[in-house]
Amino acid sequence: MLQAAAGAWADPPPTEATPAAPYLLAGAPTFDLTVVKFREKYNRDNPKLPIGEFRAIPTAEDDSPLLTRAASKLNENLYASTALEKGTGKIKTLQITHLPLQQATEEKAARAIAISYMAALMRQFEPALTVEQSQNKVNSLLEKGKGSRFYQQQVGAIRYVVSDNGDKGVTFAVEPIKLALSEP
């Protein structure tokens, strides 16, 4: 089942297939991680769910001049994307976007592959989770975010975001957040 995703291409998705992240907060922190280091570790940890090289996406007029967007095509209906801080190349968000297929029989398998990628991404930030636990957690987040342009859940210093755009696809994102000390 996962072999269909084994060939990861580096071609960026069409611009219309990668909506700008409306949930990426202005002034959001970065992970202390570049996309090259992330891919090295991710691909070493997930050899059956590889992410190919990220390619820059041409900027649109409404894009932030402080960010570089990049994407990697995983298969015909699945993309990994990121927003990087200009100058440092540090990651502000990592995303997996699943574009639904018209054929119901193919969509079930495609969705299972997408969830596997989303769960693998989650385990990069919560390494204590098992494959099953991470898949259950992703399914729960997708269910809670179903039909919502923005659903988030905070876990420590990160947040998971689900952006459901209906027939245009669903995006699962991982982003760092600023932790504030509570006042006594």
List the predicted regions and their residue ranges.
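Sec-dependent N-terminal signal peptides
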Residues: 1-2
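Short helix/turn-capping signatures at newly exposed starts of structured segments
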Residues: 9-67, 92
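A cross-family detector of function-defining hotspots
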Residues: 46-87, 127-165
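Long, charged/polar, surface-exposed segments that mediate recognition or autoinhibition
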Residues: 80-143
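Residues at beta-strand starts and edge strands
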Residues: 89-92, 166-170
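Ser/Thr- (and often Asn-) enriched beta-sheet segments in non-cytosolic proteins
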Residues: 93-95, 152, 159-161, 171-173
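Short, low-complexity, Pro/Ser/Thr/Gly-rich segments in the mature regions of secreted, periplasmic
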Residues: 168-184
